[in-house]
Amino acid sequence: MHNSPLYAAIDLGSNSFHMLVVREVAGALRTVTKVKRKVRLAAGLDPEFRLSRAAMERGWDCLRLFSEQLQDIPADNIRVVGTATLRLATNVDEFLSEAERVLNHSIEIISGEEEAKTIYEGVSWTSAGEGNRLVIDIGGASTELVIGEHSEAKLLNSLHMGCVTWLNNHFGDGELSEARFKQAIAAAKAVLEKVAEDYRALGWRTCVGASGTVQALQEIMLAQGKSERVTLPKLQELMGQAIACGKLDQLQLEGLAAERLTVFPSGLAILIAIFETLGIESMTLAGGALREGLIYGLLGNNHDCDARDRTADSLINRYQLDKEHAERVRDTAVEAFNQLQPAWRLSKRYGRPILRYAALLHEIGLCIEYKKAPQHAAYIIDNIDMPGFTPAQKKLLSALLFNQRDEFKLEPLEKQGAVTGRQAIRLARILRIALILCMRRTQGTVPRFTLEADEDALTLTLPSGWLDEHYLRASELRFEVERQQKMGWPTRLLEA
């Protein structure tokens, strides 16, 4: 593993410069280094689109930090790109000359279309989703909108608006008033109207955001006890909170990091305009974007599968799990889910996939030790990078693994934000029964079964005589029935 090569992607953005260094491990990327520095290059553009000397100096100083890390990476494994501000700057050659000398590496100024396409590449690798997917990336001086399916981008645009330019244009004096927000939103809508109909006509099933603005929003949502899905009412509520602060230098929102304060109102205004213009219902945070797209472009890997499947396969390989047994538990859990879904109104979109991955990864805690394997499994999931899984999905997965056996621990099931607490508890009940039915660990030993539910009441029916012939599993099922009844959930075990 230690001999696998390093890869690096550097994004010279309009607000921040970012460096990502990774290596490939067990078919997945492992982050080795992430460095971000706020440069605010776009703030250094004058009316003639010339970069100020001060802005260029900030950029060069940042690249001196990056250059040390690049010395250990083969040149063919490095890609450095500049985006919107460097596309606009009329004196870009002056900046690039010194920047390339400092880095000892060439820098590409990519077009807005290529930036949008690469962002989509990064999202398709690191975020799960079926059907058409709308990707939104609000940068410092441009906003990319892409609709695609799997790895194919179908419609893409790079629009001339960003959180730094909108800050300068609409919040430059630091006033956070309703009038200023209305002005900023209206200006963003004017830009969007040129392309909006194309997006509405093509349509999308899921929407993900790939920018610092959306990252900040999710941090705020979680800190304020809300679900991770971004909606227009939540955005409008946050706008109200910002307006109540009055001034940019007095802005305080629970969960908003200090480094994001300055450009948050302008990014929020742009996002509200996008939601209102396109009619977006909800959005979640993407797992990656431009830098990840650059890395996967260097690797040249085929990725026509769910990002979460790649992550699960990587973890199965890395922790040497019994894949055949894991798949048997998965199939049993999904069969149980399908039987109970109508009565329990379980979420096919949000609940079933995470139940599948919980079944596949249920033995991951055994790599530490058996007695506390469920706790170890939850700890691993909580603390490991899992491309394709949102933070709320990871919390649900962790909660299910924590509750796979022994006494129920309800708090993590109720606190996750991917599904309701009641649904999470019901998924845990399903997983526990599936694990017991699969205890023999060999093909053909899982019995036919029927699960029926009436509110919290659950009945498991097995073939006649099966319980007498399978003493261990019968005993474990009876213990499980007792545990679930103890929680106030009527549970029965029958034969027919």
From Swiss-Prot:
Its EC number is 3.6.1.40. It is an enzyme of class 3 (hydrolase). Coiled coil: none annotated. CDD domains: ASKHA_NBD_EcGppA-like (cd24117). One of its GO terms (biological process) is guanosine tetraphosphate biosynthetic process. It holds the Pfam family Ppx-GppA. Gene3D superfamilies: 3.30.420.40, Exopolyphosphatase. Domain 2 (3.30.420.150), Hypothetical protein af1432 (1.10.3210.10). It catalyses: guanosine 3'-diphosphate 5'-triphosphate + H2O = guanosine 3',5'-bis(diphosphate) + phosphate + H(+). Keywords: Hydrolase. The keyword DNA-binding does not apply. GO terms for molecular function: guanosine-5'-triphosphate,3'-diphosphate diphosphatase activity. Pathway: Purine metabolism; ppGpp biosynthesis; ppGpp from GTP: step 2/2. The keyword Hydrolase applies. Catalyzes the conversion of pppGpp to ppGpp. Guanosine pentaphosphate (pppGpp) is a cytoplasmic signaling molecule which together with ppGpp controls the 'stringent response', an adaptive process that allows bacteria to respond to amino acid starvation, resulting in the coordinated regulation of numerous cellular activities. Belongs to the GppA/Ppx family. GppA subfamily. NCBIfam families: PRK11031.1. This is Guanosine-5'-triphosphate,3'-diphosphate pyrophosphatase. It comes from Aeromonas hydrophila subsp. hydrophila (strain ATCC 7966 / DSM 30187 / BCRC 13018 / CCUG 14551 / JCM 1027 / KCTC 2358 / NCIMB 9240 / NCTC 8049). The gene is gppA.
